[in-house]
């Protein structure tokens, strides 16, 4: 996935009100940017961090700049939670996930469950449909181990329960974690940060929901899904 225009670099001053960040650009300008991320961005908001932003002069936008990448632990980390669905779709279409290869059709944002929309729906006539729920991952606190979630996510637990219902109806329920950073070799659920989600994940796997984790390579030009990483056994569940 390529960024449509070159990114602009700067230094993060602060993130606040969840969706805003103050940034000093490399040319000295001080700007306020939108932050397309509803999570805590734990470990990614230190003042002075190198950041990269996209720019749009569309008249309907209140803020022309959008935060896309933060440098943390000498690694570029994608923070735009609007991108993982596109990254996941590209990963599936290029055969990165063998168990999801070969479906005839791929549809986005299809209604299902309890007033929800599935991120990706794969269909192929006689084969069971595959309902793919995509989650963005950028949290690392142990070297090499990417974790989800970085804060409590009741919505995430609801999605797991809906995937269980999908499996019970004879379809495939897929949990696909897109890790927007390259410095991970494995993935795990952070049960200490959200025990309820961790237990929901455990129940979902026991009920037949499938889970995959994908690592990405991040540059100032774009984000590319590169390979699967193993998912560790449940850990730190209280």
From Swiss-Prot:
Organism: Brucella melitensis biotype 2 (strain ATCC 23457)
Pfam family, one: SfsA_N
Example of a GO MF term: DNA binding
CDD domains: SfsA-like_bacterial
The name this protein goes by in its record: Sugar fermentation stimulation protein homolog
UniProt gene name: sfsA
Similarity-based family: Belongs to the SfsA family.
InterPro entries xref list: SfsA, SfsA_C, SfsA_N
Lineage: Bacteria, Pseudomonadati, Pseudomonadota, Alphaproteobacteria, Hyphomicrobiales
């Amino acid at each position: 996935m390529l960024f449509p225009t070159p990114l602009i670099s700067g230094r993060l001053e602060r993130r606040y009100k969840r969706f805003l960040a103050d940034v000093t650009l490399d040319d000295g300008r001080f700007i306020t940017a939108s932050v397309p991320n509803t999570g805590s961005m734990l470990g990614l908001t230190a003042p002075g961090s190198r950041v990269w932003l996209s720019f749009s002069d569309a008249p309907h936008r209140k803020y022309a700049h959008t935060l896309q990448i933060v440098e943390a632990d000498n690694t570029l980390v994608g923070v735009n939670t609007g991108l993982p669905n596109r990254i996941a779709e590209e990963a599936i279409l290029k055969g990165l996930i063998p168990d999801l290869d070969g479906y005839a059709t791929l549809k986005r944002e299809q209604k299902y469950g309890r007033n929800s929309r599935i991120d990706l729906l794969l269909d192929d006539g006689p084969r069971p449909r595959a309902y793919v729920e995509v989650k963005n991952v950028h949290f690392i606190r142990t070297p090499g181990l990417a974790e989800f979630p970085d804060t409590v996510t009741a919505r995430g637990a609801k999605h797991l329960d809906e995937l269980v219902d999908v499996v019970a109806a004879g379809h495939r329920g897929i949990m696909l974690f897109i890790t927007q950073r390259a410095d991970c070799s494995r993935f795990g659920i952070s049960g200490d940060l959200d025990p309820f989600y961790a237990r929901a994940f455990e129940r979902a796997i026991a009920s037949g929901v499938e889970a995959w984790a994908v690592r990405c390579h991040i540059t100032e030009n774009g984000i590319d899904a590169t390979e699967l990483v193993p998912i560790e056994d449940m850990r730190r569940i209280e």
